């Protein structure tokens, strides 16, 4: 046989192939076409919104992301949170708040002030926090509603900060979790991780919100020299928050008390017969450090 030819290129092969396909049922040809088209269609539709976002907010390089404004960051984060991954953003935010109760200085203050000492006050505290954060993340940074929610939050914190009952590091840690947890949850549980554009938007937005709330990032390695972009801040605050947990997320009875009250809030709409399942799921979502700090069994 010549080097340039084989059975697969001969007329007899073409005739054989046609004969095989001609004898196949029509549904089989349709199924083969569907199997080929389906992944292409899924790829096109799944990434359609991300491609539109990257076209609308054109930051082609990491260097160009340094010019991202707070308003652009807000719009990018809003589209991603409300249209692309709405369920995971909500759950990540809830878990971020829950995770702060693993730090004794935070849980002690909540119990001491009565905010998490009984169901009535724990529901109010959770609702107030959700409302304020919702106003901040769902409205433009230049809007009246965002201004009022920031001002209200600063007022609520001011007395505790003046008396030293709220630590600046605890505030930065809480801010870090609200920025980092959605990124981590989506990377772990969704069909794709966030893009650099989306991560930069989240970092830019929460760094700016922290500044507005009077939460300093100076303790971070680049805090005094400045951050290149939102991704730079996000990565540094993520690393810092993990190191903070190693030092300060330790077992404490009031961590457990705060966690129990928070869990009761989260399971409120679930029928009581399913509460044990909800508790097991909550425990499953915890890593070993958080589980030990809250005195939950493995």
UniProtKB/Swiss-Prot annotation:
Localization, UniProt: Endoplasmic reticulum membrane
Gene disruption: observed consequences: Results in dramatic reduction in MPA production.
TM spans (from-to): 25-45
Cytoplasmic side: 46-298
Gene Ontology biological-process annotations: mycophenolic acid biosynthetic process; terpenoid biosynthetic process
Signal sequence bounds: none
Functional pathway: Secondary metabolite biosynthesis; terpenoid biosynthesis
Record keywords, A-Z: Endoplasmic reticulum, Membrane, Oxidoreductase, Transmembrane, Transmembrane helix
EC numbers on record: 1.-.-.-
GO cellular-component term (any): endoplasmic reticulum membrane
Catalytic reaction equation(s): 4-farnesyl-3,5-dihydroxy-6-methylphthalide + AH2 + 2 O2 = (4E,8E)-10-(4,6-dihydroxy-7-methyl-3-oxo-1,3-dihydro-2-benzofuran-5-yl)-4,8-dimethyldeca-4,8-dienoate + acetone + A + H2O + H(+)
InterPro entries found in the cross-reference section: MPAB (IPR046366), MPAB/Lcp_cat_dom (IPR018713)
Lumenal side: 1-24
Membrane-topology descriptor: Single-pass membrane protein
Domain of life: Eukaryota
GO molecular function: oxidoreductase activity
Keyword Transmembrane: yes
Function: ER-bound oxygenase; part of the gene cluster that mediates the biosynthesis of mycophenolic acid (MPA), the first isolated antibiotic natural product in the world obtained from a culture of Penicillium brevicompactum in 1893. MpaB catalyzes the oxidative cleavage the C19-C20 double bond in farnesyl-DHMP (FDHMP) to yield FDHMP-3C via a mycophenolic aldehyde intermediate. The first step of the pathway is the synthesis of 5-methylorsellinic acid (5MOA) by the cytosolic polyketide synthase mpaC.
Family: Belongs to the mpaB oxygenase family.
Protein name (record): ER-bound oxygenase mpaB
Gene name for this UniProt entry: mpaB
């Amino acid at each position: 046989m010549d080097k340039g030819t084989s059975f697969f290129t001969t007329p007899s092969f073409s005739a054989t192939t046609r004969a095989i396909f001609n004898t196949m049922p029509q549904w089989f040809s349709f199924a083969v076409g569907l199997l080929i088209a389906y992944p292409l269609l899924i790829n096109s539709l799944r990434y359609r919104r991300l491609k539109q976002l990257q076209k609308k907010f054109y930051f082609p390089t990491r260097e160009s992301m340094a010019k991202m404004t707070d308003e652009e960051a807000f719009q990018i984060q809003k589209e991603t949170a409300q249209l692309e991954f709405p369920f995971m953003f909500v759950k990540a935010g809830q878990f971020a708040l829950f995770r702060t109760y693993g730090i004794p200085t935070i849980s002690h203050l909540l119990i001491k002030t009565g905010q998490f000492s009984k169901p009535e006050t724990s529901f109010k505290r959770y609702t107030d926090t959700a409302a304020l954060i919702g106003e901040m993340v769902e409205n433009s940074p230049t809007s009246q509603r965002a201004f009022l929610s920031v001002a209200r939050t600063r007022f609520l914190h001011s007395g505790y900060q003046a008396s030293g009952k709220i630590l600046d590091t605890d505030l930065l840690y809480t801010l870090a979790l609200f920025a980092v947890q959605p990124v981590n949850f989506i990377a772990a549980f969704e069909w794709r991780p966030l893009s650099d554009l989306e991560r930069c938007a989240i970092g830019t937005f929460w760094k700016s919100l922290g500044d507005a709330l009077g939460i300093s990032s100076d303790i971070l390695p680049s805090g005094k020299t400045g951050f290149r972009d939102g991704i730079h801040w996000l990565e540094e605050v993520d690393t810092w928050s993990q190191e903070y947990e190693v030092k300060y997320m330790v077992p404490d009875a009031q961590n457990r008390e705060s966690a129990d009250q928070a869990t009761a809030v989260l399971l409120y709409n679930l029928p009581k017969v399913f509460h044990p399942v909800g508790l097991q799921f909550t425990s499953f979502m915890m890593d070993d450090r958080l589980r030990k700090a809250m005195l939950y069994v493995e």
